[in-house]
């Protein structure tokens, strides 16, 4: 009930207040086909506490999801349930192209789509993160959040570039994509890596069939093999559709993130 009340409060606040996000200028990328739209929301204390540094939360599909994330973090911070964060919205005009790591050839999905995920991570690592660090007071703790195919990129980053982000929030990640390359690579990573100091949140709604089976197999592998430094939290929302799992899981995702940050001294 508390989560529902908090979510309604956040959504109401978003509805009556203008967005806190501002667009920032970024040079034409040399790494991706089309430079994403970048928006930034600064914490309430940013201008008054001029010596404080902040963790950064990169929200994929930032135009659609940035206000929800920023509002929830603000509400949690007021009740000592979250650190303040710089929120960076990252919005692609072609999600499948930029977020899916591999090209899909399965006729049950969009054939021929995807394949740009690695280039998009290159963009984040080599162009966007350095720019954010230069423009704003950051503390080198970075989090990435995404839903569906954007959640797939979050999981891909978790296993392929484990030091790029210290926190990963994946809401209904599309780990069924293609030939399930990201699924298999992630299973292998958690089963063989000796040290994973990170935070991983995943959830799923009422998705069924193979989508649910694939997701469950990943959760089981992570729980079976995770080491003590990997802080995980998984949720199932049986009465929520795929489209609403980010809204449903965000409170728990951010609470778990705060616990992890407290544990490691962020």
Which positions does each model-derived feature cover?
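Bacterial N-terminal signal peptides
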Residues: 5-13
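Sec/Tat signal peptide C-region and signal peptidase I cleavage site
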Residues: 14-18
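Non-catalytic cap/lid and distal C-terminal segments of serine-dependent acyl enzymes
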Residues: 19-266
